[in-house]
């Protein structure tokens, strides 16, 4: 019985060795034909953690789970009219430029306001802007920018405004069933691999439409077919909620609105998380407002009555004064922001310690030098 088992083990080992050799030969052949790195074991990849770029909003970074938009992926931002979709995308543009990257904006709606973009922190002198005449042209321009590998972020505003050339050349009332969906499906097939290879973030803004004859369930849908839904790694549903009233002389004036951003699809972290942000008219997302709220919930900022305090020192009476204090003291803002990100695991503790060490190393060293001027100095000829 033992001999039979040993013989069986020898056959299995021999068969396993042959399979291993055949696999190695196949891997060598693939690398020879398609280049090194065309196939590899997943554990051999230099980067296994998903690289991300901050969305420009702390609350949204937390909701996304990974700490921002994943690089080399497609993002879809959709919602009702005037809900803040373009504002969310422009904050991503500003963040990309802040990190030293290059951003492009495909304005298919021909409605980008440069002054508003500048107010959100976008460097409009460096922003690449295209206002295409047709959907095919807009997607072709986006494809060439992505293929170059030199652009970090491409925003398309919006999918609904990417009108196929055949529809533009035709008459109003002509039927073009599925034309835009086919165009988007082909674009996703062409752009998907290039986006991942170049680590470009592609943000597609989309509108909402109503399905006809839906009696049960959600009648809302997004134009452009199903391809974008499948290819997108992250889908964000942006909805405006209650209006925000001003203070003092503006107490009866709407100065902004609370906006809920729901992550309805997420391939890099758990989905269905929500972020509540304050979008102030003419200013964009209130970064100080969301930081005060989140840090207070975590007791990083302490609240007693109407007073807010940090590290035992009062920073303002009422949330508006606390926001103003953080806006006037960017170093304290960054310190609190860092603590919040560490708490939610957006920054590893080791990285946090390293960054603090770098700060200490960068601090100027002041040495006291005492000169004794009582002694005479003799100079020999």
Curated annotation (Swiss-Prot):
Q: Does the keyword Nucleotidyltransferase apply?
A: no
Question: Which keywords accompany this UniProt record?
Answer: ATP-binding, Cytoplasm, DNA damage, DNA recombination, DNA repair, DNA-binding, Nucleotide-binding, SOS response
Q: List the disulfide bonds.
A: none
Q: What is its main location?
A: cytoplasm
Give a yes or no for keyword Cell membrane in this entry: no
According to the UniProt entry, its GO molecular function terms are: ATP binding; ATP hydrolysis activity; ATP-dependent DNA damage sensor activity; damaged DNA binding; single-stranded DNA binding
Q: Which Gene3D superfamilies match?
A: P-loop containing nucleotide triphosphate hydrolases
Q: Which GO terms describe its cellular component?
A: cytosol
Q: Which family does it belong to?
A: Belongs to the RecA family.
What NCBIfam families does the annotation carry? tigrfam_recA
Query: What is the role of the protein in this entry?
Result: Can catalyze the hydrolysis of ATP in the presence of single-stranded DNA, the ATP-dependent uptake of single-stranded DNA by duplex DNA, and the ATP-dependent hybridization of homologous single-stranded DNAs. It interacts with LexA causing its activation and leading to its autocatalytic cleavage.
Q: What is this protein called?
A: Protein RecA
Q: Which species does this protein come from?
A: Streptococcus parasanguinis
User: Which gene does this sequence derive from?
Assistant: recA
């Amino acid at each position: 019985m033992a001999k039979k088992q040993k013989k069986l083990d020898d056959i299995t080992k021999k068969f396993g060795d042959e399979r291993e050799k055949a696999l190695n030969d196949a891997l060598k052949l693939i690398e020879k034909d398609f280049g090194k790195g065309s196939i590899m074991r997943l554990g051999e990849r230099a980067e296994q953690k998903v690289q991300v770029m901050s969305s420009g909003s702390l609350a949204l970074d937390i909701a996304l789970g990974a700490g921002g938009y994943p690089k080399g992926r497609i993002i879809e931002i959709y919602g009702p009219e005037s809900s803040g979709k373009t504002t969310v995308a422009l904050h991503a543009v500003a963040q990309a430029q802040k990190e030293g990257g290059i951003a492009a904006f495909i304005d298919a709606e021909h409605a980008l306001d440069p002054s508003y973009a500048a107010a959100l922190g976008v460097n409009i002198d460096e922003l690449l802007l295209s206002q295409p005449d047709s959907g095919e042209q807009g997607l072709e321009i986006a494809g060439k920018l992505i293929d170059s590998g030199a652009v970090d972020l491409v925003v398309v505003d919006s999918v609904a405004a990417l009108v196929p050339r055949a529809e533009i050349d035709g008459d109003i009332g002509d039927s073009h069933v599925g034309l835009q969906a086919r165009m988007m499906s082909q674009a996703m097939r062409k752009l998907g691999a290039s986006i991942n290879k170049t680590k470009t973030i592609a943000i597609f803004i989309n509108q909402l439409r109503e399905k006809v004859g839906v009696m049960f369930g959600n009648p809302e849908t997004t134009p452009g077919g199903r391809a974008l839904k499948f290819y997108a790694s992250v889908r964000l549903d942006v909805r405006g909620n209650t209006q925000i009233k001003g203070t003092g002389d503006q107490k009866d004036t709407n100065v902004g609105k609370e906006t809920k951003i729901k992550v309805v699809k997420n391939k890099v972290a758990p989905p269905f998380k929500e972020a509540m942000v304050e979008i102030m008219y003419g200013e964009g997302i209130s970064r100080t407002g969301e930081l005060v709220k989140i840090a207070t919930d975590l007791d990083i900022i302490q609240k007693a009555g109407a007073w807010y305090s940090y590290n035992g020192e009062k920073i303002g009476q009422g949330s508006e004064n606390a926001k103003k204090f953080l806006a006037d003291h960017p170093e304290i803002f960054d310190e609190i922001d860092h603590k919040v990100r560490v708490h939610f695991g957006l920054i590893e503790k080791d990285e946090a310690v390293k960054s603090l060490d770098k700060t200490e190393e960068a601090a100027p060293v002041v040495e006291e030098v005492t000169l004794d001027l009582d002694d005479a100095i003799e100079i020999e000829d």
